[in-house]
Amino acid sequence: MDTEYEQVNKPWSELYKETTLGNKLMVNVGMEDQEVPLLGSNFLTKVRVGLSGGYITMRRIRIKIIPLVSRKAGVSGKLYLRDISDTTGRKLHCTESLDLGREIRLTMQHLDFSVSTRSDVPIVFGFEELVSPFLEGRELFSIYVRWQFGLSKNCYSLPQSKWKVMYQEDALKVLKPSKKKASRTDSSV
C-alpha cells in the first residue's frame, strides 16, 4: 500500500478556517468514487452512499487532521486504521509517529480491504501509542481522537475507550523533583 503523509506548519487562524472542511475518506462503490466526511466522534453525521455493487473497496483515502493539542505540548502518536467488526480490531494500516500539534495530511492510494454492502463493518481511525513529555495525570486532550466510518442501515456507535498514554523516559529524566522540593523549603523558611 502506498502511503504519503506530511505535517504542515500553518498559523492557527488559517487552520481554524479549514476545520469546517473536516477529514474526508474517498470510497469506491462499484465504478464510482464518493467522498465521505469524517467528523469527530462527538458529532453525528449521516452520509448516503449509493450501493451499486456487492462490495465497497477503500481507496484513495485522504485524511486531513487539524492540530489536536497545542504544539508546545509535544504530544505525538501513530494513526491506526482498524476493522472493528470483531473483538480483534484488525489493523489495516499504521503510520509512523506524528506530531499531534501540527496539521497532518495522510494519503493512501490503496487499502487492501473490502466491505460487503450488506454487512455492518465499521472502520475506525484513531491515534494510539501516544507519547507525551508530561507527567501522568495531566489532561492532554480536549477532544476525542477517534473517527468512525461505518456501513450500516442502523445507527451504530462505538463504546467509549480510553487510549493508553506512554511517556518519554528522557523527557521525564529532565524533571528534577529534588530541586523543586528544595525551593519550596527555602520559600517556607
Swiss-Prot record:
GO terms for molecular function: RNA binding. GO terms for cellular component: host cell membrane; membrane; viral capsid. Disulfide bonds: none annotated. It is found in: Host membrane. Coiled coil: none annotated. One of its GO terms (biological process) is transport of virus in host, cell to cell. Keywords: Host membrane, Membrane, RNA-binding, Transport, Viral movement protein. Pfam families: TBSV_P22. Its main location: host cell. Transports viral genome to neighboring plant cells directly through plasmosdesmata, without any budding. The movement protein allows efficient cell to cell propagation, by bypassing the host cell wall barrier. Belongs to the tombusvirus/aureusvirus movement protein p22 family. This is Movement protein.
